[in-house]
Structure formats: structure tokens, C-alpha cells
């Protein structure tokens, strides 16, 4: 069995790199196999290096999506829709286009469903859903291992703004409702809690914990962009309780 060159020097285009692989043909049955070329090996090595350069900005695991948050995420989802009680993993990475590689790794690791994948100018985000927590966490672990990161290496959240405003006026309520088309409407006289975080994805954890803690209405949840923004409304006492739960959730991540 003798190796025969798969590409002669004279056949190569000007300026193209030399391919050093060879095709080995068997004289007995005519079968052949292709030996990996040096150029292919360098490509594989370069791809592995690129994956390891991906920066983990946000890693948010929600054990059980609350009804309002699940419904809200469904209104903005372009993929599979979540249902209340599903587990959810939200990840944000940098650079933005790296989210395609992260998504590919996560989906091939388990039976999770892809709800959202957003490519921004600087960052990329994705949302994974499944009814079993272990399935979602497994995909997350595989991604972390692939990019050489850990949960503790994610960017710590910081709170840019937090406030409770009591007894919203009619004019204010109308403008809020016209700006936010995906969530519920706020009514005049309600109290409102607003929260702004960086990175953006952490507002999902705040929203989920706030809904668990009190009888409030989710008005708006923006988990993409430079900052995450959460708006809740309800009775003053309920809003204050939900606000405390939301801030506590952010602080727990910061102190992890």
C-alpha cells in the first residue's frame, strides 16, 4: 500500500498554503482513507483556543419559573416557549458571536430546549429550558468545562438603581404602559418597584424571586443590553416585600 499525494505543488493556487496530508489507497480492495493534514490540525487547535477565550458574563439558574415571568419570557421568545415550573439557565458571553458556539455545545449536551438566542454588539445571550433541573444544569456544566470557566468566574452583578415609587399618577401609568408591550399594565394608584443591574441577565433572578415572595404584577423585564431593567407593581406592602426579595437575590449572587 503506497501513499499518493492528494495535491501536487504545481496544482496549488498561488499564495495558498501547502497541504501536507495524503490519501492512502489499498491495492487489494481499492478502499482509501484520508490522513488529517497539518493545516486541519492547526484549524482544530485554533478553534479550541477560541472557545477558551470566551468570557462568561452572566450565569443565572432559575430552579422553577414563576407563572408571570414564564409568560413574559414567552412573549419575547423566538424559540421554544417556557411553561411555569420549567428550570431555566440564562447565560451571557463575550464576544457576542461566541453565543453560537456556546449554544451548540449546550444543545448537544442534553435535551434542553432553546428559548432565546440574542447576538448584540458586544455580548451574546441564550436561554435554555427543561422540566428537569439536572438536565439544564448538565448543559451548563458542559459549557463551563468547554470554555474553561466556572460559575464563580462570572461577572458579579452590581445594582445601578433601585427605588419604590408609591401611588403612580395616571399620566405616568399611561406612558409606562405604552413603552412596555410585553408585560402586564400598571394602573394609576399602584406602587412601583424599579431595579437596574449590570450585567443585564441578573434581573431574571430578581424577577423570579420577587414573584415568589409577594403578590405583585410583572410590568417589564429587560435582560439584554448593557443594563438589565425590572419593573414590578402592586399594593405598597407587596411591592416592598418583592423589592426586598429582588435585592436579596442580587446580593446573594454578588457574595457567592
Swiss-Prot record:
Question: The motif Gates the pore: which residues?
Answer: 120-121
Q: What molecular function does GO assign, one term?
A: structural constituent of carboxysome shell
A Gene Ontology biological process term? photosynthesis
Q: Which SUPFAM superfamilies match?
A: CcmK-like
Instruction: Pinpoint the BMC circularly permuted domain residues.
Output: 55-157, 158-256
Keyword set, alphabetical order = Bacterial microcompartment, Carbon dioxide fixation, Carboxysome, Photosynthesis, Repeat
Which cellular component appears as one GO term in the record?
carboxysome
Concerning its family, UniProt says: Belongs to the EutL/PduB family.
Q: What does this protein do?
A: Part of the carboxysome shell, a polyhedral inclusion where RuBisCO (ribulose bisphosphate carboxylase, cbbL-cbbS) is sequestered. It may control transport of RuBisCO reactants in and out of the carboxysome. There are estimated to be 6 CsoS1D hexamers per carboxysome.
Domain topic, free-text comment: Contains 2 BMC domains, trimerizes in a staggered manner to give a hexamer; each subunit in one trimer interacts with 2 subunits in the facing trimer. In each stacked hexamer one trimer forms a pore of about 14 Angstroms in diameter; open-closed and open-open trimers are seen in crystals. Glu-120 forms a salt bridge with Arg-121 of the adjacent subunit to close the pore. Dimerization of the trimers forms a channel-like compartment (volume 13,610 Angstroms(3)), accessible via an open pore. This channel may be large enough to accomodate transport of substrates into and out of the carboxysome.
Write down what this protein is called: Carboxysome shell protein CsoS1D
Q: What is the lineage of its organism?
A: Bacteria, Bacillati, Cyanobacteriota, Cyanophyceae, Synechococcales
The encoding gene is: csoS1D
Amino acid at each position: 500500500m503506497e501513499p499518493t499525494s492528494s495535491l501536487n505543488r504545481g496544482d496549488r493556487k498561488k499564495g495558498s498554503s501547502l497541504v501536507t496530508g495524503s490519501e492512502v489507497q489499498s491495492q487489494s480492495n481499492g478502499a482509501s482513507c484520508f490522513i488529517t493534514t497539518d493545516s486541519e490540525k492547526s484549524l482544530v487547535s485554533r478553534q479550541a483556543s477560541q472557545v477558551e477565550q470566551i468570557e462568561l458574563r452572566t450565569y443565572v439558574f432559575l430552579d422553577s419559573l414563576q407563572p408571570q415571568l414564564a409568560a413574559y419570557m414567552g412573549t419575547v421568545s423566538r424559540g421554544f416557549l417556557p411553561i411555569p415550573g420549567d428550570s431555566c439557565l440564562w447565560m451571557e458571553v463575550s464576544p457576542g458571536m461566541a453565543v453560537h458556539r456556546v449554544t451548540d455545545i449546550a444543545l448537544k449536551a442534553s435535551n434542553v430546549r432553546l428559548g432565546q438566542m440574542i447576538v448584540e454588539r458586544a455580548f451574546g445571550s441564550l436561554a435554555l429550558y427543561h422540566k428537569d433541573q439536572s438536565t439544564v444544569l448538565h448543559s451548563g456544566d458542559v459549557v463551563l468545562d468547554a470554555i474553561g470557566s466556572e460559575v464563580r468566574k462570572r461577572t458579579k452583578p452590581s445594582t445601578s438603581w433601585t427605588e419604590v415609587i408609591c401611588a403612580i399618577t395616571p399620566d405616568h401609568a399611561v406612558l409606562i404602559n405604552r413603552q412596555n408591550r410585553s408585560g402586564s399594565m400598571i394602573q394609576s394608584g399602584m406602587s412601583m418597584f424599579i431595579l437596574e443591574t449590570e450585567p443585564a441577565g441578573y434581573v431574571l433572578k430578581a424577577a423570579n424571586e420577587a414573584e415568589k415572595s409577594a403578590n405583585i404584577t410583572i410590568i417589564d423585564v429587560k435582560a439584554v443590553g448593557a443594563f438589565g431593567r425590572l419593573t414590578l407593581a402592586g399594593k405598597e406592602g407587596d411591592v416592598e416585600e418583592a423589592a426586598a426579595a429582588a435585592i436579596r437575590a442580587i446580593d446573594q449572587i454578588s457574595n457567592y
